[in-house]
Amino acid sequence: KMSDYVLFKNLDNKYLTFKEALEENKEKHENTIFYTNDPVQQSQYVNMFKDQGIDAIILKDNIDQPFISQLEQKNENVKFVRIDADLNDSFTEEISEDELKDATEKLTETFKKALNRDQLDVKVQKIKDEKVSSMITVSEESRRMQDMMKMYGMSGMDPAMFGGSGETLVLNANNALVKYILANPEG
């Protein structure tokens, strides 16, 4: 009952109710409320959201994670997603299967070798903002598991025990630097 009266602060410092936050971007993402827990640290994502005209709310207190889980349980069709969890279709352009497969294979090999991380997940997408060369996304499920582990004092545990870190390196196929690396994998 009280969820109708709870106010969320959005990226423009406006306060919205739960229903208003859902309604705000209904055309762009049905039944999804995007949020940030640190607008400064996630400023690249915040700027991308603003550029695409997509709103997000700010949830930076410890009580927010259990609260949004409770809201998701009470409203089964509603999902809260942190802005760095994944790039939805509003931020990307279509890419052909052949081009995607070729670029992903080449760039995955190059970055795994350069970063010396065999377990690195690499994803290639055409992000609309050509200035962005790469981003790290963390799946919502993995991030929530990590938050829960921190809350219960288990932060020293390895997230790989629960199916990996959920981190993905997203490379922008529209970026000049990524195009250069693709054309010159040896440098």
Where are these regions (language model features)?
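Conserved GHKL (Bergerat-fold) ATPase module
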Residues: 1-187
